[in-house]
Amino acid sequence: MSTQFVSRIAVEVDGEGEAAVCIHGLGGSSNNWTTVMGALSRFRTLRVDMPGSARSASVSGPLSIDSLAQAVREVCARLGVERAHLLGHSLGTIVCFKLATESPQLVRSLALFGPLLCPPEGARANIRARAQRARDEGVPGMQAIADAIVAGATSAETRQHRPAAVALVRESVMRQDPDGYARSCEALAEAQAAAVESIACPTLLVTGDEDGVAPPQSVRAIGDRIAGSRVVVYSRCGHWTTFERPDECLRELKDFYSAHAR
């Protein structure tokens, strides 16, 4: 494994083979994918810390889905990736849908966890309010946001019986730069749905039955619009799928890539 920086974007690079590019969600990092790396051993895997998140440099201007997608394109171009299997979580799935519809030549397949096309209209104001809280309160605000996310975005079973998963989620969120997190929130709040009917690559959509961000009925509706896609719903699982159900995610990815990768 090596850590590389592309225009101040941190990228963890592992292995050799076809490229796989991993795009985390809001409050995430390259560590979101640690639990499923065993399914990616056949690939040259690029785990990106998105602009303004984790170890990547803070940004001075606004973030948007367009700018996040362009950052992924730049990482791929600079690291010699012409086509890649894309993996995404949450906000990262919106970026993946953007790339698959606007740069289909880049995308071999999609494996998406907690996928959504854009936030429901009623959620946008709350996301903007979270951005403002992060800016106004700084580190204490991030700690409070992390606690709220653990309470609202993980399953009851995870909170009761998977303390390591809870710790991973909380640590991931509360260690974000407050301003970078706020800008990422604003990108999510402004996201618009991609025309996913045009997606022709193999697509895996995974969610949990207690995922309020990507509820099963919404994920199935996305799957109905993508020809040949597979939808998987884990029981007693919330939004942080790879942390809450690591073994199941690992097996599902192994099966998916056995069918759709060299």
Regions found by a protein language model. Name each.
Residues 88, 92, 96:
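Gly/Ala-rich beta-loop-alpha elbow adjacent to hydrolase catalytic centers
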